[in-house]
Amino acid sequence: MSPQNLKKSLTNWDLVSVNPIDKNWDWKTLFCFWGVNIQSVIGFSLITSLYVIYDLNTFVVFFGTILGTLLVYIFSNLIGKLSQKNGLPFVVLLRSSFGVIGAKYFGLIRFFVGVFLFGIQTYFLSKAFSYLIRIAIFSTEPTILDKEIFLIFFLGMNLIDWTSIIIAIILQGFLFSAGMNVNKRIIIFSAIAVYFGMLLFFLSVLLSDVKFTSQAFLNILKTQNFLDKNNFGPLITVTSTVFAYFSVVILSFGDFSRYVKDESQLKKGNFSLILNLLIFSFFALFIVSGMDAFLKQDPENLNRILTNPTDILGKLDNLFLIFLALIFIIIASASTNLIVNFIPSQYTLVNFLPFSLSIRSAGAIISILGFIIGIFWLTFLSQVGALSF
């Protein structure tokens, strides 16, 4: 292969070292980055389930989650430092370990996993859009939803569902492919907006009956026998669970740390994950405990405590609160999809065909594949156990 062709097969402008002018991420940006990663529906369910479902000592869960995030902090610094220093995405740095060809095919595995999860996440994101549309129609004219056109289903979805998944894929593809400066704004906006939404719901639960909800929060805390040797196993399990939750993000962290100003900002920003965990855990746990206390005043809701935000919304009878919560869920889900699945898939695909693709064209391919995966998720992929591995 000639030197010119070899150069074309190795790089393009999206893979080269970041211009120093574009190294504009500081610790506050990384605070929002880690906030987005924990603010997902899965993150909400995971944190609250660890505290209230498995009958674990509260201190065991607390210190287990702290230890887990400390491990994330250490490994994120190790992986992120190289990308921050050299301004290169993670998949390009892999060339030093796996070689050019090895890095391409290793990255391709990450691409397939990322695109598959992007499609699934897009499907669930579209469900939130469809709920918004249904609420809007129901609030205007409820009988419209009974029309025959809405009773026709294809691949398990009706007209509203198809409209929703098309909206979800177009919005994500358009916004996420606009460049890292736009993605940075999305990340910052999402983190702040979701925390603002959680604060609103926290206050709405608290102020509905301060004494009742505060007592409900205290009642779910289990602090006895923390130093019991039998708690060591659960402590390790919680630590491992939290680390596993962030492991996909750690693997691709260099795709983001390449934009960080310096190593000091990198370490400060990564340490903010612990602060994010504390803030998010408190809000999530208080909302879940307070809602559970109110719901269990009805004998029909005595069976189990709800930790999934969508399950909690299903028990509300206030359309405005449901509508508002769905908007925050959409923001959180979309931004998580951006960080965990879309951007890493872009870089790995461009690295595989650097002479043919750009970030924008790779984004278009990911959007198309994600759409195909999303529309077949309900009727086919979920039925064959596509995530059983």
Residue locations for each model-derived region?
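Membrane-interface "cap" regions at the ends of multi-pass membrane proteins
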Residues: 1-59, 70-73, 198, 208, ...
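Hydrophobic, small-residue-rich membrane helices and short re-entrant helix-turn-helix hairpins
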Residues: 23-27, 177-191, 248-279, 340-361
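Transmembrane helix-loop boundary segments of multi-pass membrane transporters
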Residues: 51-63, 136, 141, 149-158, ...
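Extracellular/periplasmic helix-exit of transmembrane alpha-helices
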Residues: 52, 208-218, 275-309
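Juxtamembrane transmembrane-helix boundary signature
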Residues: 64-98, 108-113, 119-123, 291-295, ...
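Helix-loop-helix connectors at the membrane interface of multi-pass transporters/channels
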Residues: 91, 95, 125-159, 338-367
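Membrane-interface loop-to-helix entry segments
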Residues: 120, 126, 163-208, 270-273
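Hydrophobic alpha-helical segments and their helix-loop junctions in multi-pass secondary transporters
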Residues: 122, 126-135, 193-223, 245, ...
